[in-house]
Amino acid sequence: AYPEFAREELSRAVRIPTEGPISDELAEILQMVADHPDVYLNTGHVSGPEVMRILELAEEFKIHKVLIAHPARQQLSIEQQKDAARRGFFLEGCLVDWLYPHAPRTHYYVEKKYMDRSGDLPRMRRSAAQWMADIREVGPEYFVLGTDYGIRAAPSAVQGMRTLITTLLDYEFTPDEIRTMTAHNPARLIGLDPL
């Protein structure tokens, strides 16, 4: 998605093997998270098979707080999402997964040479209705909602959250369910008392 970044930086990235032994660097990261139970592990923007391996490794390292980034975008099946929820992991519900311009853009890096080309990649696009049905099927009690807005090419995070909450209400999520996903679950994830 970032051709120039990939050429310059990818060789330094910590790899997540989908099977077999892991690198010392990955083991060190997982152990650091395990040693600090107040910290949660975010799977990051990786593939579906890599997500499933991270979850397996999190259990192996006894990491109890994990947030699966963009499960809809990672093309995790609904069964994989439900399995992750049953295992006690949170799933991220993010507005950009269904409402965002997918044209090339600069946001993480201001230099044009680092332009995000992810909009050019073929991928399954989920509609708002599909996304809402997935949240309903897995269960709001397992989701942490956000927008990923606020970057240069998107509206503000506040505008995004307003859109997200309005859409949830339109799809008949209750105020209590919305509060669970926007306040209660995030508080649990970072170790605060439920709000």
Residue spans for each PLM region:
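Mid-to-C-terminal alpha-helical segments outside catalytic/metal-binding sites
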Residues: 159-195
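A structural motif corresponding to the C-terminal end of an alpha-helix
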Residues: 28-39, 134-141, 171-174
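Catalytic core of soluble alpha/beta enzymes
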Residues: 51-53, 67, 72-104
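Short acidic/histidine-rich active-site segments
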Residues: 94, 138-157
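Divalent metal-binding pocket/active-site signature
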Residues: 1-79
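Charged helix-capping and loop-helix junction motifs
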Residues: 23-27, 123-130, 159-164
